[in-house]
Amino acid sequence: VTVLTSISESQLGALGYKDNLSLSQLVLDRARCAEKSGCAGVICSGEEVAAIKNICGAKFKAIVPGVRPAWGEVKADDQSRIVTPKGAIANGADLIVVGRPIRDAKEPAVAAGEIVAEIESTMTNLG
């Protein structure tokens, strides 16, 4: 895990990180460290996938949690850095993790089907 998707830039100082260290720099530093240590990939926000792939290579896997469909409001959501399924895939995510939008839906199977349709549409459009 690079940085939990529930952590925002403003929380870094409270967690003991230097004031001049940005969240994106911390994520990239941790991804670089993971890659140099022989890891096949990292868990990261969809916002950071493109930058990670840029420094670690296209084959370095990016698993993206905190994925929220545009229509899927999650009450009391603790996630700070979220993306839609379309956004995660367009940014280069290899795998996405969608939990609460399906689990908490009135009809989970329908919600899952809509997310799958969004993924398929995005994959088709990206070619």
State each model region's role.
Residues 31, 49, 85-86, 112:
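Generic hydrophobic/aromatic pocket-lining and core-packing "Φ" positions
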Residues 24-28, 77-86:
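Charged helix-capping and loop-helix junction motifs
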Residues 37, 91-92:
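Structural motif
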Residues 34, 52, 88, 99, ...:
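Conserved, mostly hydrophobic/aromatic
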